[in-house]
Amino acid sequence: ALGALKNVGIEAMKLITEGRMVDGVERPFSTLFDLARRVDMKRVGKRPLEMLARSGAFDQLDPNRRRIFDALDGLVGYSAAIHEQKSSNQVSLFGEAGDDLPEPRIAPMDDWLPDERLSEEFKAVGFYLSGHPLDDYMAALKRKDIKTLDQVHERAERGAHVAKLAGVVAGVQIRKSARGNRF
């Protein structure tokens, strides 16, 4: 399902899914660094990883989406170094290839504000998943007898109905006709 996210694709998700398999058993990633060690993030690509961070796919590893998003360059570099070392069969004195590489520092920072978080999620998924920009206004909308889309559908099944709706303008496109008139 995550392969359907914008700019992610099946191949990127296949690499991540394969990284979850350890000795034939599916094991979830425990941290972002565990993900970087088990999946060659450079092969996955930065753009798919950005979209996964925006969508909340890594929320179990770190709920601060902005920190993950901003740390991707370091994580991709760390992952590339580990996988380069593994492919050259270099093993440290202390264990497997890449185990001796220090984890990059992820700077502490505030997460995106709720509106920013929803906006970033919308960019990745194409709709609001964890909330809606109008959630903060629901009490006021109910007082004004504004209906939800579900309520409108429910009433429409019973016959013609007039309803007030609220929405969010997601974008504006101003175009010009052949005569130069804007519409």
Question: Which role does the model predict for each range below?
Answer:
Residues 160-173:
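OB-fold and OB-like beta-barrel modules that bind single-stranded nucleic acids
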